[in-house]
Structures are given as structure tokens and as C-alpha cells.
Amino acid sequence: MPNVRLPFTQDEYAERLTRVRTSMAAAGIEVLFTCDPSNMAWLTGYDGWSFYVHQGVLVGPHGDPVFWGRAMDARGALRKCYMAEDDIVSYSDAYVMSSERHAMSHLAKLIADRGWANACLGVEMENYYYSARAHQLLSDDHAGTLRDASLLINWCRAVKSETEIKFMRRAARIVENMHTAIFEYMRPGLRKNELVAEIYRAGLLGGEDEEGTFGGDYPAIVPLLPTGLDATAAHLTWDDQKLEAGAGTFFEIAGCYRRYHAPLCRTIFLGTPPKDMLVAEEALQEGIANSIDAARPGNTAGDVARAFYAVLEKFGIARDGRCGYPIGLSYPPDWGERTFSIRPDDETVLWPNMTFHLMPALWMDEWGLEITEPLLVGTSGPATCLADYPRKLFVKA
């Protein structure tokens, strides 16, 4: 469409579409319906806050993808997507939050009108944006078979292009600025909501690289910054209470540029940290270094995890769960790509230009400690840290 400013070239979108169709053919899927906004954006360029209603992209055997969504959002698709107007299809507001009709009936008719009534249709059954009711109605109305295509496109996104890596490096510049602002403003007596305002300010102001300045985007997850005993829990946000001396606060945040994320977590202690936290800091620093060294092309996600857990075992620290996940393009409620995990039993092979968040946080009985890194798998040797920020427990009097 004229006057559409796409974040990537037409050639890159065409290569992505080919990659998806290759995966569809391998899975025996003739037509694919994705409602994950990350996958929609990756395939078409669409970027809008419309994922609270039913929407999606159809990929058929031939031709461009088809955007399908609410009528008022079709105008946004015309402004953001590369497809022609005939491939931007909408349903009326009569379908929105109605107990009498459902948008999936409209989608089923669209699929039939395109000549795909009897096609094997792939749907993302394990997805935040695809409801049980939607699946039931689509199953009833579509004459062909439905097949689970969860993560099919997500896996196609695993290896990043050079432009995607550039966007993630910019996101990393942004998150560095966010942490600099946190350390500057954090002090006893400051209300947490005021600190969060500074975090958002730094994140949206953006950053600078050799090409000039650039602005930030909203991250898929809000800032997580629990303090003291609250920091023994992983996913608490903030309140309007004042920060007090004698406690640590971890900051789980990400810079975001054109929907590409670079998460980076650090912890600040106001006062003197307890000795066991300092020992844990030493363990994390050594474990992270081990993991980065293990994150080489041809190694596995499990190799990276085992390298980290070997250090924890040496320090006598017990920890359950994974210690990382892939990152890139994302929308709320999560900035992860939801494919592989950095854990000992995951044998996913690492390829050059894969990106993941090494996230070996420790949530102990009396405090929490987060020191993490966004990593890029190279063509050889250890992974590269996308961000350049001191890897330590910060202490502020």
C-alpha cells in the first residue's frame, strides 16, 4: 500500500512467508490462522493495540497473507501492512462482545469465500489470544479439519535477521538508559510509583547509536520491582509505598524498539547487603559467565543451563526452574517467544542469530536477586551480550 512505512523490506517479509509455508507443508497444514499479535506483526507489519478483540492473519497456499479484524482496526491494517486492500478484511462491530453472534462465524465464511472451505486449517490452540469458545465455533463452522499449529510461526522467528538484531541492539541501548536512571533516582523515601515514572520516561525517550537517536516503545511486561520480602516472589509490580534503607529491590525491565525487546535485570540494595546475598552475587556472576561461554552455535539450551547449575551446585545453592527463554518481537502479556527454554533437559540446538534472555534469578527466603543478560548466539565462540551494563549487585547508601 502507498505511504505505508514498514519496519522491514518487502524481500524480508517475502522470505518470512516462504519460511512459514515450508513449515506448514511439513505439518500437513494447507491454511494457517494466527491470532498471536507478534506473529501477525512479523508476517505483515501490523502493529496496533487491538488484540483484545478477535483478529488474525490467514496464510493460504498462495498469495499474500490476509489480515482479518474489527472494522475500525482494518484502517490501521491499511496503514501498517504491506498487503493490498483486497487482503484487508473486517467484520462489523455487531460481532464485538455480543452474546448473539461471534466473530469466528465471520472468519469461517471468509475462509470458505477464499476457496479454503475444506482445507486443513492450522490454529494456535496454545495461545493467549485464542479462546475455547472461538475454537469450538470455528470447529463447528469450518468444513475441513482443524490442526494444532501452536508455535509454528514462533519457531520460524527463532533465527533473527540482521535488521532484527539491529532493533534488539537498540532496545539494549534503551534498557541501559533505564537502569542508569533507576540508580540515579533510587533513594530511601522515594515512592515506588515515582521511580516507575522515571523508568517509563527513560524507556520511551529511547537511545542513540551510530545512526543517530531513536525512540522507545512500550514493553510487553510492566516494570517488576519488589523490595525486601516481596522480592522473594518473582512477578510483583509496584505500589505507592516509600523505599526504605536496609532492603534490596530487583528491577525486571526491558528496553523495547519497534516491538523488539532486550530484557536486562539488576538489583539495588539500599544500605549494606547481607553476606548470603553477596555470596549469591558471586555465584550468579560465575554462573552467568559459564553459561555465556556454553552458548555457542551447535550446543544446546540444556548445555547452557547445565553450565549454570554446575556453579550453583558448587556454591550449595538450590534452584528450581528454567534460567532463560528466547526473546525478540512481542506483545503483552509476555516478551518471551515461548519456544525453547534454558533448562537442563531442553536439547534445542542453538543456531547463529538466535537470541535469548539468560535469566538465572534467585528468589530466596528473605530476599531476591536478579542479574540477567540478553544474549545473541554468534557464528562461533561464546554468545554476545546485547547490553553493556555492569553485571553486579548495586549498592547505594
Regions found by a protein language model. Give the residues of each.
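Active-site neighborhoods and metal-handling regions in enzymes and metal-associated proteins
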Residues: 1-397
